Amino acid sequence: MAIHEECGVFGVMSTKRENVAGIAYYGLYALQHRGQESCGIVVNDGGVFSSYKDLGLVSEVFSKDTLAHLSSGNMAVGHVRYGTTGGTTRNNCQPIEVNHQKGKMALAHNGNLSNALELRDKLELSGAIFHTTSDTETIAYVVTRERLVTPSIEDAVSKAMNSLEGAYSLILMSSTKMIAARDPYGFRPLCYGQMSDGAYVIASESCALSAVGAEFVRDVLPGEILVFSKRGVESRKEHCDKQKRKTCIFEYIYFARPDSVIDGVSVSKSRVRAGEILAENYPADADIVIGVPDSGLEAALGFSRASGIPYGIGLIKNKYIGRTFISPGQNERMDQVIIKLSPVKNVIEGKRVVLIDDSIVRGTTSKRIVKLLREAGAKEIHMRISAPPFLHPCYYGTDIDSEENLIACHHSMEEIAEIIGVDSLGYLPLENLNQLVESEDYCAACFNGVYPTTIPTDLRKDRFERKLSERMGVAK
């Protein structure tokens, strides 16, 4: 697999002063799959903020000592990051903290603004000074600007949403309140729950609620603003129903953890269904079905059930390294495949194998996995992909930045099969995507090129940071 989502957000608001940093720590641990470059936690203790942020995994950044650095409090917001806008630097670690005339706030954001550069230009012209190359800081400053002329932080967020374009699921913590907001399309997931002691928990995925013992309440609606305070939860829906829901379909195929439920749809069931559809559309005469860990496993199970071909564990994942897109260079990605996956020879040797994976982007990772299976003695390899071919860039928070890097833009399915070294290849048909979520309310722009929002003609993943670097005279 060679694709990555960008972030996970987590927030907790307790009814009493306690170790909210510890709760946030476990919540971020459950969201680690959404971002592995950096992480951070900001704690609010009666309006006094303390924070710790750094590059690395949750287990690397936080220890007993670093958690002890964070005071007890009644609120905390946390973030795990994989950068799709802005570089991998400590300055870009989230949550972003801002002090302003009416108070302070900490902001954690999952998504990608398509108009970030334009907003930043306007803010700089009005005197704003930026310290990062992340679009999250842009959101923070837009909210801050509105906060100076509005009576409440929730009013400021609502006003700011009129200016924001693209994907954003965010958690904002002020001195006295916590805000959860989701863009009007609902591109990225966001939900909340409640713990037995009354504490509220907000997270990118429901799996993080379960990890801290919170009971799922519901998803944040597209366009909705939830205000958590001493009075409870207030819902503001002035931005709801402005657009048709367009949740990213790839959340179900790959990004989300299989035990999560997004907008009422089980991620695990979606993946099993994808495998069943593949078996119906691209059957194979084979001896065993295996999945590429982790997101290919449920689809492999579905293919096995629908085809009657036995399911087996043919690839073992080393769980102590990050996903392959964490490495910036192609050679590093290849090296990570070698240490990340190991074939089970006695399962594969002499067998005709159906290999299930969630996608092919460049083809680099798939080619190496196929080579591993050949070396383990696979007689035939029939690869099935639980998503349609990637043909277009994503501008809503996924690391697919240009068509030049997408193998399906340059080669036919037969040519791709030859390039990666498989005997046959089949993709999930585009027209069957709706069966994964039993709805048409999803974004599949990376597959069909139909973008729900207006996209600047020169927009690329690196456009935001590239333009800023040019201004600052930084060599790229």
Description of each model-found segment:
Residues 308-353, 364, 391-397, 401:
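Short, glycine/charge-rich flexible loops or terminal/linker lids adjacent to PRPP-binding catalytic cores
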